[in-house]
Each structure stands twice: as C-alpha cells, then as structure tokens.
Amino acid sequence: MFPSPVTTTPFSVKDILNLEQQQQGGLAPMELSSPSCMLATFKQEAFGSEPPALPELPEPPPAKPPAAFPGPYYVKSYGEMDTAKDSKADKKELCALHKSLEQEKRELEDPERPRQRKRRKPRVLFSQAQVYELERRFKQQKYLSAPERDHLANVLKLTSTQVKIWFQNRRYKCKRQRQDQTLEMVGIPPPRRIAVPVLVRDGKPCLGESSPYSSPYNVSINPYSYNAYPAYPNYNSPACNANYNCSYPAVQPVQPSAAGNNFMNFSVGDLNSVQPPIPQGNAGISTLHGIRAW
C-alpha cells in the first residue's frame, strides 16, 4: 500500500483521486496471483488449523404439517395473483366517480337547467298473429303457470315477462268491461219532480192570487171527534155528562187498647163490612170516559 500524502483538506479533489488509486493498488496483487497459489493457501488453512469443536445442540423438533385449507382459497400464490382484474375494476370505479362529479358540477353551474328525464323503454308492439294467439289462449285460460308461460313465449318468440304483462293487462281490461256492463244494466232512476208554489213574481208577492197549495198525496186532515162513543138506547147523552157523587160510610173509630200501646187493633171483618156504594144507573155508564166506580 502506498503511503497517503499529507493533505490539509480531506475532501479535496486530489484526496479523492488518491483514495481511488489506493483501492486499485490493493486489489491488483490479488487479481495477478495464480489460482494454484490460492489453492495451496486454502489447503494449508484447512488442514493446518482445525476449528474448535462446537457443543452439541439438541435436535430441532419436527416441523408441524401445514394446516389443511380448502383448495379454492389457496390455488395461486401471491406472485401468481392476477392484478389485471383489480386494475380494471379500479379504473371503472374512477370513471364512474369522475362522471358523477362532472354531473354535479354541471348542476351547480346551471341550477335553472331542467334535469334530463329518463328515457322510457320502447313499447312492445305485438304482431297480429301474436295477438290472435294470445287472445285465443286467454279465452281458454286466464291464468298461466310459469312453465306454460315459458312455452307460450317460446312459441310466439316473446319473453316470459312480455307474456305475463300482456295477460295482466288483458285481465284488467276484462274486469273494467264487466263493471261498465253492470252500470248500464242497473241504470240511474230519473229525478223526482216536486211542485213548488210561486211566492214572488216580478217582484210582487203572489200568495193571494195563487190557489191554495194542495198536498201531492191528497190527505185530508179532520179534527178528532170526541163524540165517537156508541150511544146507549136506555140512556140519554145528558146523563153521561152528569157528575157522580160517591158517598162512603164513615169508619167507626177504633178504641185504643187498655195497654196503651201505639199499635191499632182491627179485624179483617171490619174491612169487609165496608161495601162500596152502588151508583145509580146501569154499570155500562161506568166505562164511559175511562172512569171506573169503586
């Protein structure tokens, strides 16, 4: 190795160049040495000095077998995983997000601009042959099962949804027709005509000139006759209007008992001895005007 010159600045250009030269000079003898010399030195080091014996180490425990996982989850290693699909999905999400942001930006810029209406699906137009076949099948069967609907759709070259919607609309149309027919059969009764008297004509009351109002039902109201009782042949009517005077015999006073208590003692015979007076005249008069004689 060459002695390094004394330098005042260790980071000067000369110092850097001298360091490179020293590294090249140290590597040169190793490169020029023959391989036979290198082999001899290696053999001397290998047989001349034996390494110290290492202490015996315990044998490592046997490795546990890896846990059995289902195959579909570990088919590929991490290096073999396909990242192309993930990148495509990320690109699609970014594109959708970008479009939504642009749409919101446009709405904010033009708030008065009406939003675009969603385009409706075109209406399905059935051919005459398809309509004829559908009508013929509807007359036979108003409700179809799923296999029958699929078979009919394949025959008519339609989708199962189109056949289903057509049958729904046809059932609703048939129901409306039945409702209209029932309304026509029942009909609405004509309005009643009611006679109303004219009270004012040309600004003048016409109650006196008009004929008296007649009831549409021609019901005559008569005063209730009170003399509707049947006449008796043996009695005149003045006798019916006569006042009745009933006289009852006085009850004998009951003498108090010797004991002087507050109770009254009387017998049932005293009550039966009192007889009601017999009014003058026949008993039929007592039934007049709801009056009963006791």
UniProtKB/Swiss-Prot annotation:
Cite the Gene3D superfamilies for this sequence: Homeodomain-like (1.10.10.60)
Calcium as UniProt keyword:
no
Keywords, alphabetical: Developmental protein, DNA-binding, Homeobox, Nucleus
Taxonomic superkingdom: Eukaryota
**Residue ranges of coiled coil:** none
Where is there biased composition of kind Basic and acidic residues?
A: 102-114
One BP annotation, GO: septum secundum development
A Pfam family that this protein carries is Homeodomain
Q: Which residues bind DNA?
A: 119-178
The compartments listed are:
Nucleus
Q: Quick one: where's region Disordered? A: 48-69, 102-122
Tell me the GO molecular function terms.
Answer: chromatin binding; DNA-binding transcription activator activity, RNA polymerase II-specific; DNA-binding transcription factor activity, RNA polymerase II-specific; protein homodimerization activity; RNA polymerase II cis-regulatory region sequence-specific DNA binding; RNA polymerase II-specific DNA-binding transcription factor binding
Q: Specify residue ranges for compositional bias: Pro residues.
A: 52-69
- Recorded GO CC terms: cytosol; Nkx-2.5 complex; nucleoplasm; nucleus; protein-containing complex; protein-DNA complex
Q: Please report which protein family the annotation says this sequence is part of.
A: Belongs to the NK-2 homeobox family.
Q: What is known of its domains?
A: The homeobox domain binds to double-stranded DNA.
The annotated subunit structure for this chain is:
Homodimer (via the homeobox); binds DNA as homodimer.
Q: What does this protein do?
A: Transcription factor required for the development of the heart and the spleen. Implicated in commitment to and/or differentiation of the myocardial lineage. Binds to the core DNA motif of promoter.
- Under what name is this protein listed? Homeobox protein Nkx-2.5
Organism, as annotated: Gallus gallus (Chicken)
Q: List the lineage, top down.
A: Eukaryota, Metazoa, Chordata, Craniata, Vertebrata
